[in-house]
């Protein structure tokens, strides 16, 4: 399973990229707004840091297929690695069909059911993004959704990749890998948590003390 980082914070992207663990970035209107920066300038800077798929979403106010298509074409011009995030709606599917034929990569977002994922894949989506944390929030099983989509795609040889989104903690990451997700897009805070274990800290401290006992500080 591959890792993308889910943020528009350039400093976080740099830190994660320096670890050598991420191969892409996902953003959304909320993440861009949180940074208080211009969308295009932010995306352009991100493309100079990570050489991999960069998802930029059409505006939340864009609801008609023709408008999504026009906006997606502009986003795709920013860089060769751009992937356009399109919401899972009827109009969104219409846009994905056209964009796919034009060779523009798409990431259909806000997926909450296997049927939605299947429709998006058949429309030509490069990626689908099921939101597991938000399903967990309403007492549904987000990870079961990943398993179901993965099984359907494998059964029918569907090449659309599954991006596990709304990942809240390291256990989500492990379970997504087991469930068959191709990619997990995670916040920087989760990446940090994944690097840590109390026994690792204890082991490092013991090695340090043992060394200092013999050789001094």
Swiss-Prot record:
Leader sequence segment: none
UniProt-listed Enzyme Commission number(s): 2.2.1.2
Record field: catalytic activity: D-sedoheptulose 7-phosphate + D-glyceraldehyde 3-phosphate = D-erythrose 4-phosphate + beta-D-fructose 6-phosphate
Pfam families xrefs: TAL_FSA
UniProt key word Transferase: yes
GO CC terms: cytoplasm
Annotated PROSITE patterns: TRANSALDOLASE_1, TRANSALDOLASE_2
Pathway terms, separated by semicolons: Carbohydrate degradation; pentose phosphate pathway; D-glyceraldehyde 3-phosphate and beta-D-fructose 6-phosphate from D-ribose 5-phosphate and D-xylulose 5-phosphate (non-oxidative stage): step 2/3
Domain of life: Bacteria
Subcellular location, principal: cytoplasm
Similarity section: Belongs to the transaldolase family. Type 3B subfamily.
Biological-process GO terms, alphabetical: carbohydrate metabolic process; pentose-phosphate shunt
PANTHER family reported in the protein's UniProt record: TRANSALDOLASE
Enzyme active site: 85
Enzyme class: transferase
Record's subcellular location: Cytoplasm
Name assigned to this protein: Probable transaldolase
Role noted for this protein: Transaldolase is important for the balance of metabolites in the pentose-phosphate pathway.
GO molecular function: aldehyde-lyase activity; transaldolase activity
Keyword line: Cytoplasm, Pentose shunt, Schiff base, Transferase
């Amino acid at each position: 399973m591959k890792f993308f980082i889910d943020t528009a914070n350039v400093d976080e992207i740099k830190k994660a990229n320096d670890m050598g663990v991420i191969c892409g970035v996902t953003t959304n209107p909320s993440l861009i707004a949180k940074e208080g920066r211009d969308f295009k300038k932010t995306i352009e800077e991100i493309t100079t840091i990570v050489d991999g798929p960069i998802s930029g979403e059409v505006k939340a106010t864009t609801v008609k297929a023709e408008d999504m298509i026009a906006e997606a074409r502009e986003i795709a011009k920013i860089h060769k690695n751009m992937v356009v995030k399109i919401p899972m709606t009827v109009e969104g599917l219409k846009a994905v069909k056209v964009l796919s034929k034009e060779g523009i990569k798409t990431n259909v977002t806000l997926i909450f059911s296997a049927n939605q994922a299947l429709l998006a894949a058949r429309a030509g989506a490069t990626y689908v993004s099921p939101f597991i944390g938000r399903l967990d929030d309403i007492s549904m099983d987000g990870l079961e959704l990943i398993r179901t989509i993965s099984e359907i795609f494998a059964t029918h040889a569907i090449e659309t990749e599954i991006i596990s989104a709304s990942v809240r903690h390291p256990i989500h990451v492990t379970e997504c890998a087991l469930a068959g997700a191709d990619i997990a897009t995670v916040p920087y805070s989760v990446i940090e948590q994944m690097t840590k274990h109390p026994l690792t800290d204890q082991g490092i401290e013991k090695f340090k003390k043992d060394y200092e006992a013999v050789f001094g500080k």
